[in-house]
């Protein structure tokens, strides 16, 4: 079976709550680090989530 291009990433909250989302991204079309504004349920606000490594 062929190995896919998409790689799992972890989106960490910039609010410092420890909350994170996991998603996948295509490394070939998006080589830079991902930043998305998403909802953080701990602080109950939309904050910026930055890409980090899955441990």
Curated annotation (Swiss-Prot):
Per its UniProt record, what InterPro entries does this chain match?
Answer: Ribosomal_bL33 (IPR001705), Ribosomal_bL33_CS (IPR018264), Ribosomal_bL33_sf (IPR038584), Ribosomal_zn-bd (IPR011332)
Q: Which Pfam families match?
A: Ribosomal_L33 (PF00471)
A molecular function (GO) held by this record is: structural constituent of ribosome
Q: Which terms does the UniProt entry file under GO BP?
A: translation
Family affiliation: Belongs to the bacterial ribosomal protein bL33 family.
Keyword line? Ribonucleoprotein, Ribosomal protein
Q: Which organism is it from?
A: Aeromonas hydrophila subsp. hydrophila (strain ATCC 7966 / DSM 30187 / BCRC 13018 / CCUG 14551 / JCM 1027 / KCTC 2358 / NCIMB 9240 / NCTC 8049)
Q: What is this protein called?
A: Large ribosomal subunit protein bL33
């Amino acid at each position: 079976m062929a190995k896919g291009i998409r790689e799992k990433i972890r989106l960490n909250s910039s609010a410092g709550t420890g909350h994170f989302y996991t998603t996948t991204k295509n490394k070939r079309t998006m080589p830079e680090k991902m930043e998305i504004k998403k909802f953080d349920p701990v602080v109950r606000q939309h904050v910026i989530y930055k890409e980090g490594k899955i441990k």
